[in-house]
C-alpha cells in the first residue's frame, strides 16, 4: 500500500540521462572521512576498492554531511545515526528527527497536551510512573536533559511516586561516564523528594546486556530488563544507584555497556520499584530500534518470547512511536515525523524494480527506515527484500567480517539476474565493530566491507551498470576521543580514551561504472550537501527528474 492522498506519482524523464541502467547502491555503515592516522581504521585497513573510487576522480567522488541539521537533528554537535541517516537517504528531504521533535514538544509544552500524556497521567494519583531508558547525554538514543524535564513536568502535573529504571551507556559516550549521569539524576530525584514526591532509581544495567536489544537478536537481553523492572529481581541488589554503578564497574573487565542488571532495595531487602497493576510506564528513548522489543514485552498480550511471569495492567507510552507499521507502542508522548513520498515509493510507482539486502542488525535500515519508517513493500511485484541473519550471542569484534561476504554475494546475484533496476545494500561492519572500541577488529571489519564493495562493483561492471557508494554516518574513521587541539585524549591514568560512538565527520559518496553517461559529474555549487541530496541523485541516474521539493541532486551533466 502506498501513501494516501492525491499525489502525482509520475516522474518526468530526465532530459539528458537514460533509463534502464542497473544501479548498485551501497551504504557503508559507520564509514566517515577523517585524517589518516593510527586511530583511523579505514586508513589502516587495506581498502583498494574504496580507494579506487576516490583516487584521481574529483568529478565523481566527494564528501557530504551526515550529522546535525543535515539529517534533521537539532545542532551541529549532534552525531548522525543509522536511523536518521537512512531516513534522509530514502526520503530526499530533511525532517525534524527524534531529539528535535522531543525538544520542540517539551519547549512548547505540547507534550503535556497530547493524548499520550493524558493517558499515563491517569496513574499519577494512585499509581507510580516509571521512566525506563538510556541515561546518557549522547543524543543518539536519549538525552539526560529531556529526562530531567520530564521528571520536573510529571511532578508539577501531579505525579506523586516516580521510579527511574536506568540503562548505562558507554557506547555513544565515554565508558565510565555513567557515574556522573547517575549523580546528576540522583540530585534531581533528591530535589523532587524535598518537594514531597516519592522519587528514586529502582533498577538498572548496561544497555547491551539489559533491555536494549534490537531486531530480535537476543531476547534474553530484554528478559533481564523485564525481570529487574517489572519483577524486581536481579542478581545484584544495592541501596542506591550510585553504589550499584560504582561497585559493578569495579569488577574486572566491567564497562558501562555491559553492566549486569541490578535492583535497588530498601532496608528490608525489598525492591523499591517493581512495576505493578495501575502504574504508568514511559520509555524515554527517542530512537526506535532498541526500544521495539521491550515495547512488545510491555504491550503485547500474546507475547511469547520469554516467560514474563507476571504481566501488570499498566498504562504504557513511548517517548515516540517506535514502529509505525506495527503501531507500537499504541500510545506515545510525541508524534513521529510524517515522512511521505519517499524515493522508494516514487520509484515503485514508476516501474523501477528494487532489491534490498543486509544482515539483521541493519536490515531495517535499508527497508523500514529507508522507506520513511514504514514496514513492508510498496509493490510486492517489483520489490524483494532479503535479510541475512546476523551472528547472535557474541560481540561483533569476535567476528568482525560479519556477513559482508554473504550480503555482497546476494547483491551480485541480484545484479547479474537482470531482474532488478536498483540493488541496495547496507554493509554494517564499520559501525557495529567500531562500537566495540576494538581497533584491530575494526580494521578487519573495514577490509571485509571493502572486499564486499569490490564484489558488487565487479557485478555492476559486468552488466554495464552504475554504482553509487556512500555511508550513513561516521564511526570507524576515528576511534579515540580527542582534546581541543585534536590530539588523542588520555584518562587520569594516562590511558588512551577509546571512542565507541559515531562521529561528526562527513561521509564519502562516489558514482561511476560503465553505465554512467559521459559528462556526469558532481556539482560544486551546492552549499552544504548532505545525505538528503542522495535520493534525487539516484533518481537522476535512473533517468528521472526528482520531485521539486526534494533536496537538490548532487550531479549535473556537462557537454564534453
From Swiss-Prot:
Q: According to the UniProt record, what class of enzyme is this?
A: isomerase
Q: Which residues form the active site?
A: 82 (phosphoserine intermediate)
GO biological process assignments: glucose catabolic process; glycolytic process; pollen development; response to abscisic acid; response to blue light; response to carbon dioxide; stomatal movement
This entry's comment on the bound cofactor is: Binds 2 manganese ions per subunit.
Q: Which reaction does it catalyse?
A: (2R)-2-phosphoglycerate = (2R)-3-phosphoglycerate
User: Its domain of life?
Assistant: Eukaryota
Detail which positions bind substrate. 141, 171-172, 207, 214, 287-290, 362
Keyword hit for Acetylation: yes
Sites where the protein binds Mn(2+) 2: 29, 82, 472-473
Modified residue annotations for N-acetylglycine: 2
Residues noted as binding Mn(2+) 1 in the record, renumbered to the chain: 431, 435, 502
Main subcellular localisation: cytoplasm
Quote the Pfam families the UniProt record gives.
Answer: iPGM_N, Metalloenzyme
Q: What's in the keyword line of the UniProt record?
A: Acetylation, Cytoplasm, Glycolysis, Isomerase, Manganese, Metal-binding
Q: Where in the cell is it found?
A: Cytoplasm
What results from gene inactivation? No visible phenotype. Plants missing both PGM1 and PGM2 have no detectable phosphoglycerate mutase activity and show defects in blue light-, abscisic acid- (ABA), and low CO(2)-regulated stomatal movements. The double mutant ipgam1 ipgam2 exhibits a severely impaired vegetative growth with pale reticulate leaves and don't produce pollen.
Q: Name one GO cellular component term.
A: plasmodesma
| Assembly with partners or alone | Monomer.
PANTHER family per the UniProt record, alphabetical: 2,3-BISPHOSPHOGLYCERATE-INDEPENDENT PHOSPHOGLYCERATE MUTASE (PTHR31637), 2,3-BISPHOSPHOGLYCERATE-INDEPENDENT PHOSPHOGLYCERATE MUTASE 2-RELATED (PTHR31637:SF13)
What is the annotated role of this protein in its UniProt record? Catalyzes the interconversion of 2-phosphoglycerate (2-PGA) and 3-phosphoglycerate (3-PGA). Required for guard cell function (e.g. blue light-, abscisic acid- (ABA), and low CO(2)-regulated stomatal movements) and fertility (e.g. pollen grains production).
Q: Identify its protein family.
A: Belongs to the BPG-independent phosphoglycerate mutase family.
Q: What is this protein called?
A: Probable 2,3-bisphosphoglycerate-independent phosphoglycerate mutase 2
Designated gene of the protein:
PGM2
